[in-house]
């Protein structure tokens, strides 16, 4: 994979109850786990994410996809794709996907958060996904190239 051009991005570990978040500086040097969002509704998520994007001058979004061992979509990865597309279109920001297979286990081990239920693990996962994206890509895709969501939120 080709290393993407560094830019200020926001990374998501999407879940039905929480969304883990992480961001990086415009040069892609420092990755920071941010406070997770405890989900209530899509509109509330959007309001919080939009505010964060303005505050951090975000130029793109990274969404983790929980693919199976063979790299195929799962029910949850389809939810993640649709959520990411909807957020990217609402914010008019480019988007990239990162395979997050086993990332919760990796983050739990790395940060000793195996039994966390507060959302710290979700944001630690988002940070690992962002680090992976900075190393491996892929490039951010413009909103105009994204398919329409298939599932309503």
UniProtKB/Swiss-Prot annotation:
NCBIfam families: RNAse_H_YqgF (TIGR00250)
Protein's UniProt name: Putative pre-16S rRNA nuclease
The enzyme's E.C. designation: 3.1.-.-
Biological process terms in GO annotation: rRNA 5'-end processing
InterPro entries in UniProt: RNaseH-like_sf, YqgF, YqgF/RNaseH-like_dom, YqgF/RNaseH-like_dom_sf
Top-level taxon of the source organism: Bacteria
Keywords: Cytoplasm, Hydrolase, Nuclease, Ribosome biogenesis
Keyword Repeat: no
Listed HAMAP family: Nuclease_YqgF
Biological source species: Prochlorococcus marinus (strain SARG / CCMP1375 / SS120)
UniProt-recorded Gene Ontology molecular function terms: nuclease activity
Catalytic EC class: hydrolase
Protein family according to the UniProt entry: Belongs to the YqgF nuclease family.
Localization annotation: Cytoplasm
Main location: cytoplasm
Function text: Could be a nuclease involved in processing of the 5'-end of pre-16S rRNA.
GO terms under cellular component: cytosol
């Amino acid at each position: 994979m080709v290393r993407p051009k560094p830019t200020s991005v926001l990374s998501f570990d999407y879940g039905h109850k929480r969304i883990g978040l992480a961001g990086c500086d415009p040069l892609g040097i420092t990755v920071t786990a941010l406070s997770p969002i405890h989900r209530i509704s899509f509109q509330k998520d959007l309001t919080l994410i939009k505010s964060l994007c303005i505050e951090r001058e975000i130029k793109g979004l990274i969404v983790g996809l929980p693919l199976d061992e063979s790299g195929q979509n799962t029910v949850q990865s389809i939810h993640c794709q649709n959520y990411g597309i909807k957020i990217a279109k609402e914010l008019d920001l480019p988007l990239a996907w990162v395979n997050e297979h086993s990332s919760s286990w990796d983050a739990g081990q790395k940060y000793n958060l195996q039994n966390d239920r507060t959302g710290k693990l979700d944001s630690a996962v988002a940070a690992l996904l962002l680090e992976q994206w900075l190393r491996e890509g892929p490039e951010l895709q413009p909103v105009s190239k994204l398919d329409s969501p298939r599932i309503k939120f």
